[in-house]
Regions:
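Extracytoplasmic c-type cytochrome modules immediately beyond a signal peptide or single-pass transmembrane anchor
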Residues: 5-61, 65-66
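Extended intrinsically disordered, low-complexity coil regions enriched in Ser, Thr, Gly, Ala
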Residues: 6-7, 13, 17-23, 56, ...
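Sequence context surrounding c-type heme c attachment/ligation sites in exported
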Residues: 9-10, 69-81, 93-108
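C-terminal capping alpha-helices of c-type cytochrome domains
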Residues: 30-52, 63, 104, 109, ...
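Sequence/structural segment immediately N-terminal to covalent heme-attachment motifs in c-type
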Residues: 57-89
Length: 148
């Protein structure tokens, strides 16, 4: 759990430093210490994932599944599963859980990476090559995934 909690602590620190921009979150983390951030990360990663979203469009989710599992070779987009895991559970400390993520939130984050608003060299490069239709498909698939 320690490594998994580090991902959330890292994101909270990014909000506090201004590296990640969101006025609501920046206000919430302004007075947090690094130890507070670690504790919050540990708390959230101790929670069992709930089925928070569902895929609403089976055809779109099917296209998204192909992208998630195999990528898009002609656009040099790797499979999401390579980093985030086949079941979307994430990989401790480095890659967040994607399974069951709300499509609207996930799409906003992919677009933020594509525009450079959110900084992560790997995700910036990948999303810059994605078409919006690819993003819509993959977030639809992720919504229907259930992390184990």
């Amino acid at each position: 759990m320690l490594f998994r909690s580090q991902y959330i602590a890292k994101q909270l620190a990014a909000f506090k430093s201004g590296e990640r921009k969101n006025p609501i979150m920046q206000g919430m983390v302004a007075n947090l210490t690094p130890e507070d951030m670690k504790s919050i990360g540990a708390y959230y990663f101790a929670q069992r994932p709930k089925a928070s979203a569902i895929a609403r469009d089976a055809t779109l989710a099917g296209k998204g599944q192909k992208i998630y599992r195999a990528g898009i070779a002609e656009l040099k987009i790797p499979a999401c599963a390579g980093c985030h895991g086949g079941a979307g559970a994430g990989i401790p400390a480095a890659y967040p859980r994607l399974a069951g993520q709300w499509p609207e939130y996930a799409l906003t984050q992919l677009k933020a990476y594509a525009s450079g608003e959110r900084k992560n060299a790997q995700m910036n490069a990948i999303t810059a090559r994605m078409r919006e239709s690819d993003m819509l498909a993959v977030v639809e698939y992720m919504a229907g995934m259930r992390a184990r």
